[in-house]
Amino acid sequence: MEVKAKQLDSVNATASVKIPSGMIKSEVENLAKKASKSVKMDGFRPGKVPVSAVLKRYERELTQDAEQNLFKSAVNSALQELKKENKELVGEPYFEKFDRKDGEIIAELILSFKPEIKLEGYEKLIPEYQTPKVSKKEIDEKKDELLKRFATPEAIKTKRALKEGDFAKFDFEGFVDDKAFEGGKAENYVLEIGSKQFIPGFEDGMVGMKIGEEKDIKVTFPKEYGAAHLAGKDAVFKVKLHEIQELKIPELDDEMLKKLLPGEEKASVEVLDEKLKEQIKNEKLFKLVNDELKGKFADALIEKYNFDLPKGIVEQETDMQMRAAFNTFSEKEIEELKASKEKYQEKRDSFKEEAQKSVKLTFIIDELAKLRKIEVNDQELIQAIYFEAYRYGMNPKEHLENYKKQGALPAVKMALIEEKLFNDIFIPKTEKSEKVSKKEKEDK
């Protein structure tokens, strides 16, 4: 096997590899001999399977394993020549060239190493911003939202017609072709008008009804309705309204304050207002950081700090962005890309600049996290994945296993580190901004 290594820049090197067919064959036979001692095959006793039988059945798998072993050996040889250690590598070696002819393999690999980054003066790049303000109106609206969660429907005493937002207590029975259908009847059913819980047209048909009134409401079941025998059918619902209910929002008394402020010894409107103010401010700040500040800061970091990027990582990121974009391409575009290598390469190259920025920012964030001692442990990682699973109604353990199988845990961890990092950077900044704002007022 021939291996020639060449350093391209501070973080990239090439390894030109030539593996003779005889070496591949020899490695395949060695693996077959080892496998023959443990493999189980009908017609042979354990440990007595002939090498020829193993080769015949598992030649493809053995060849793949043999080539993988030989390339590992080639990479180790290249690292020795470059006077580098395996632990210095970042990402997997990237195949820039791979040719197979007459059993011989000629390949060129890109070996990438972690760049050394100095982020002196990064604090000056943190964008200035005004601390989010919270108005009394916003606090009152948030209080109303909280109280509505404890609201209960109560029958109205005044005589008026049913309107959207009311709760109706009524009987109904549905008919298709003048025949009652199963599951289409109920008594004293309570429905919020406007909630769109019933099929289109039903709730609109009830608007304007008065207590004691009976009415036939004509509707059409959607074509995609769950019950196939009703899908797309015209129907008539005979409805009788018994009661109109309105949501009664509770008073903000001492009892309600205790519910809204559990564990608070001195539960009061003032304490609630202060907590809601802090909550709203944090929500605004979180939105500001994610919608504006993170992007500005990231762009400034990318522009200021320049260093060699690991080519293999950039190529892998480019491939990933290209694959993700495939979901947005039209069938015509996909066919054109499949038919033309030039067009495919041109389209792939269009993602290169964004891939470079993404890789560059990843290394900068990683270095910033170390400078500011930001870490994410395994427990935090698992909790984040479990929370995501609960949010989307998925099995948390299966969701975690899927991330493991896809090799996506490092990406999730990096996203969590990034979130903690930006919080660490911008939250203290708020306190400084408040002090600056106060001083500016005093100076005026």
UniProtKB/Swiss-Prot annotation:
EC assignment: 5.2.1.8
Chain ranges of the PPIase FKBP-type domain: 165-250
GO cellular component: cytoplasm
Broad class of the protein's primary localization: cytoplasm
Presence of keyword Phosphoprotein: no
Any GO molecular function: peptidyl-prolyl cis-trans isomerase activity
Keyword terms: Cell cycle, Cell division, Chaperone, Cytoplasm, Isomerase, Rotamase
Pfam families tied to this protein: FKBP_C, Trigger_C, Trigger_N
Location in or out of the cell: Cytoplasm
PROSITE patterns to which the protein is assigned, alphabetical: FKBP_PPIASE
InterPro entries recorded: PPIase_dom_sf, PPIase_FKBP_dom, Trig_fac, Trigger_fac_C, Trigger_fac_C_sf, Trigger_fac_ribosome-bd_bac, Trigger_fac_ribosome-bd_sf, Trigger_fact/SurA_dom_sf
Record comment regarding domains: Consists of 3 domains; the N-terminus binds the ribosome, the middle domain has PPIase activity, while the C-terminus has intrinsic chaperone activity on its own.
Role, per record: Involved in protein export. Acts as a chaperone by maintaining the newly synthesized protein in an open conformation. Functions as a peptidyl-prolyl cis-trans isomerase.
Protein name: Trigger factor
The organism of origin for this protein: Campylobacter jejuni subsp. jejuni serotype O:2 (strain ATCC 700819 / NCTC 11168)
Gene giving rise to this polypeptide: tig
